[in-house]
């Protein structure tokens, strides 16, 4: 999950103030199955941006993100109710390239754009949303499901304004943030997403920003209410373990041309040697002792239907 400039990308917190340690990191990330071609940990991480060049620099935490979600191991929780999302399109402010992703930011001084319900005890205000994507369609999402990756992932970032005075404070504390993750898959053209895509040429370079008014990001949500949830962290430094993750089960469809426009953005500022903005995701992290809960029963998700046994009269001799 990319952190916006309000945190100055790393919340202006130096590594000396965080519990960092250097240690050997085993290759815990499973092989990612893709329909196009084999998508392995090594292949996927070969071209990661400079943020993740030193993969042995990890925080001394036990609830890091992203993770691989295993359907079989997730636990159905009947107490998880549907999310209630209420976004005011008028709170949309601007879109900008922060050098790691492109973000759409919202006015968050009041509860005009909020999410509640599900695993959340309070209303959380929408601060921004952004995407992660790959250099090719075989990967790009930060989270995976049964080791399957998607070409991109949307993150809608919210903060707990009941317990905290500011987004910056909330981002560093437990239960401070709630992030909704939505997978993107190749399919039909996404009409609402096109408004974002049409703006991307104007923010091609790092630190470019343009106004982007009246947009309701709920149009980017899948219709299915089902989701997984777990306790995790930011996926960019300082990697604070402050996030309640809510990962939607159903992906949304976008067409290949729309995704290709994401890849025209640059990590670099104007005048610098161009470096395409691709593979802007963090490597998978071990689950440790956490439980991933689901709002749905597994047999429903897998569309398993138990057919009744035929009666004697229905059996063909």
Swiss-Prot record:
Primary location group: mitochondrion
Targeting presequence: 1-33
Domain Alpha-carbonic anhydrase: 37-296
One GO term of the biological process aspect: response to bacterium
Tissue specificity note: Expressed in the heart, liver, lung, kidney, testis, and skeletal muscle (at protein level).
UniProt keyword annotation of Cytoplasm present: no
Xref: Gene3D superfamilies: Alpha carbonic anhydrase
Keyword Acetylation listed: no
Gene encoding the protein: Ca5b
SUPFAM superfamilies (UniProt xref): Carbonic anhydrase
UniProt name for this protein: Carbonic anhydrase 5B, mitochondrial
Coiled coil: none
Domain of life: Eukaryota
Protein localization: Mitochondrion
Requisite cofactors: Zn(2+)
Pfam families: Carb_anhydrase
Binding site for Zn(2+): 130, 132, 155
Catalytic activity reported: hydrogencarbonate + H(+) = CO2 + H2O
GO molecular function: carbonate dehydratase activity; zinc ion binding
Role played: Mitochondrial carbonic anhydrase that catalyzes the reversible conversion of carbon dioxide to bicarbonate/HCO3.
GO terms under cellular component: mitochondrion
């Amino acid at each position: 999950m990319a952190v916006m400039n309000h945190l100055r990308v790393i919340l202006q917190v130096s590594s000396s103030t965080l519990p960092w340690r250097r240690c050997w990191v085993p290759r815990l990330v499973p092989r990612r199955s893709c329909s196009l071609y084999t998508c392995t940990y090594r292949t996927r991480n070969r071209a990661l941006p400079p943020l993740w060049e030193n993969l042995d620099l990890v925080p001394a935490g036990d609830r890091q993100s992203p993770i691989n979600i295993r359907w079989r191991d997730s636990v159905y929780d009947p107490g998880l109710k549907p999310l209630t999302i209420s976004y005011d399109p008028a709170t949309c402010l601007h879109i900008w390239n922060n050098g790691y992703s492109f973000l759409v930011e919202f006015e968050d001084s009041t509860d005009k754009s909020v999410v509640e319900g599900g695993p959340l005890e309070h209303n959380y205000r929408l601060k921004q949303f952004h995407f992660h994507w790959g250099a090719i369609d075989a990967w790009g999402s930060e989270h995976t499901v049964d080791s399957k990756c998607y070409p991109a992932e949307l993150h809608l970032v919210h903060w707990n304004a009941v317990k905290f005075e500011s987004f910056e404070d909330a981002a560093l504390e437990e239960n401070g943030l709630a992030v909704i993750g939505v997978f993107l898959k190749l399919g039909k053209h996404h009409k609402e997403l096109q408004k974002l895509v049409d703006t991307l040429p104007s923010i091609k370079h790092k630190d470019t920003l343009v106004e982007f008014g009246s947009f309701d990001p709920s149009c980017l949500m899948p219709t299915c209410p089902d989701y997984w949830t777990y306790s995790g962290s930011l996926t960019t430094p300082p990697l604070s373990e402050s996030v309640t993750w809510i990962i939607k089960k159903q992906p949304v469809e976008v067409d290949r041309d729309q995704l290709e426009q994401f890849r025209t953005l640059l990590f670099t500022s104007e005048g610098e040697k161009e470096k395409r903005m691709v593979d802007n995701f963090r490597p998978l992290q071990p689950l440790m002792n956490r439980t991933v809960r689901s709002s749905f029963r597994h047999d429903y998700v897998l569309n398993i239907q138990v057919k009744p046994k035929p009666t004697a009269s229905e059996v063909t001799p």
